Amino acid sequence: MQTCPLAFPGHVSQALGTLLFLAASLSAQNEGWDSPICTEGVVSVSWGENTVMSCNISNAFSHVNIKLRAHGQESAIFNEVAPGYFSRDGWQLQVQGGVAQLVIKGARDSHAGLYMWHLVGHQRNNRQVTLEVSGAEPQSAPDTGFWPVPAVVTAVFILLVALVMFAWYRCRCSQQRREKKFFLLEPQMKVAALRAGAQQGLSRASAELWTPDSEPTPRPLALVFKPSPLGALELLSPQPLFPYAADP
């Protein structure tokens, strides 16, 4: 039995060669693709909590650009050359090799919106992710009636000063009343003293004055001797020496 060798036409051989070349080229190119893997879709976080969004590529980043679109306005958050660590208004971006992480500390309403990533490695890639912040900003604690320490110290100091001033005022008023009362009583005291002195002087003067008795005070009797013819003394009846004299 005779066999016939397979033979391909010329255009078929050229086509196969072209396909092999393209496959080899694609394989070589695939080794340099970034193949980014990023946080996508919608990320929800409660008010005040932290959140992280990231993008990873097969090659090292050379440039990272992140923008935020919210309320119809678009603003650039980071436009940095990698690698490095960057921070701004609660956002923190860290780029090292093929890893880029965006950290939000204490999410607020101003952090919510559409984040647009523009990544540059061996290729340029664009990614988007939406951040939603739920919940409302916590209200400040109601006044419980307690005063802060500086206010308490100030109030106590003012109270002490007021008490001291009040005590001084009362003492001053009492002293003024005593002085006024003394000034009012001083003339009366002087008059009373003059009267007392006058009465005492009159008493002394009346004691020193001599007042005659209504009847004379009898004086002691004296013996009177009269010569007798017989040459002897005759004893007469006693007679007062000064019959009409009176006691002083």
UniProtKB/Swiss-Prot annotation:
Stretches of the chain found on the membrane's Extracellular side: 29-145
Record-annotated disulphide pairs: C38-C55
Residues linked to a glycan: N56
Keyword line: Cell membrane, Disulfide bond, Glycoprotein, Membrane, Secreted, Signal, Transmembrane, Transmembrane helix
Tissue and organ distribution: Detected at the highest levels in peripheral blood leukocytes and breast cancer cell lines. Found in leukocytes of the myeloid lineage, with the strongest expression observed in granulocytes and no detectable expression in lymphocytes. Expressed in thymic epithelial cells and fibroblasts.
GO BP of this protein: immune response; mesoderm development; positive regulation of canonical NF-kappaB signal transduction; positive regulation of T cell cytokine production
InterPro entries from the UniProt entry: Ig-like_fold, SECTM1
MF-aspect GO terms: cytokine activity; receptor ligand activity
Transmembrane domains' residue ranges: 146-166
GO cellular component, one term: extracellular space
Highest taxon, organism lineage: Eukaryota
Membrane topology recorded in Swiss-Prot or TrEMBL: Single-pass type I membrane protein
Induction behaviour: By IFNG/IFN-gamma (at protein level).
Gene3D superfamilies: Immunoglobulins
Cytoplasmic side: 167-248
Signal peptide extent: 1-28
Function in brief: May be involved in thymocyte signaling.
Family note: Belongs to the SECTM family.
Quaternary structure note: Interacts with CD7.
PANTHER family: SECRETED AND TRANSMEMBRANE PROTEIN 1 (PTHR15123:SF5)
Protein's name according to its UniProt entry: Secreted and transmembrane protein 1
Organism: Homo sapiens (Human)
